[in-house]
């Protein structure tokens, strides 16, 4: 007998619906496209780098709203594992396949909280020779910021939504590899992460 879970019942409340997300992603894509067309680096297509795994849904939706030529790649920097709180010691665990020397790179993140993971990625990309690095984060949990966001060259920060200091899942974001397939962003009920040793991020 197959037992199925109703993941929707694990959600305390919905923060952003699928329609609200779709509208905001379209706005972000338009803003990035406009900036790229007026950039000094416009002769070479920008490289959009999705941060695996949480950003994959946002990344796919974003690039499909961008009409101009772009290149895409993925990177992974791990700091969460199966807990709800960042370990504070991220490391690059999936390297880029594309050459990024003298190219403008846009990092596409699901959520920025402490800033440690993002700082690790940006520093890594600069060491690889990127001429400038921008960041497009679906959610920004600025209340938890520990490391300031430092971009270089023509780098710019694009933010989808300001996120309250609660643990969110859905739209590619998970807890213990669940909830990525929810079409919205919601707050996870405490009883579904209460067995973890960490408090929610």
What are these regions (language model features)?
Residues 1-201:
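PRPP-associated nucleotide enzymes
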């Amino acid at each position: 007998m197959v037992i199925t879970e109703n993941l929707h019942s694990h959600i305390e409340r919905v923060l952003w619906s699928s329609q609200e997300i779709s509208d905001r992603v379209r706005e972000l894509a338009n803003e990035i496209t406009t900036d790229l067309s007026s950039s000094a680096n416009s002769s070479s297509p920008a490289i959009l780098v999705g941060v695996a795994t949480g950003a994959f849904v946002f990344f796919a939706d974003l690039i499909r709203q961008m009409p101009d030529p772009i290149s895409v790649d993925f990177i992974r920097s791990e700091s969460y594992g199966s807990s709800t709180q960042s370990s504070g010691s991220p490391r690059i665990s999936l390297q880029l396949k594309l050459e990024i020397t003298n190219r403008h790179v846009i990092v596409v993140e699901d959520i920025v909280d402490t800033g440690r993971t993002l700082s690790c990625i940006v520093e890594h990309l600069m060491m690889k020779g990127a001429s400038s690095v921008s960041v497009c984060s679906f959610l920004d949990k600025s209340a938890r910021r520990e490391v300031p966001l430092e971009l270089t060259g023509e780098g710019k920060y694009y933010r989808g939504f300001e996120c309250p200091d609660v643990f969110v899942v859905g739209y590619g974001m998970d807890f213990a590899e669940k909830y990525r397939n929810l079409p919205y962003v919601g707050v996870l009920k405490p009883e579904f992460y209460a067995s973890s040793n960490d408090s929610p991020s």
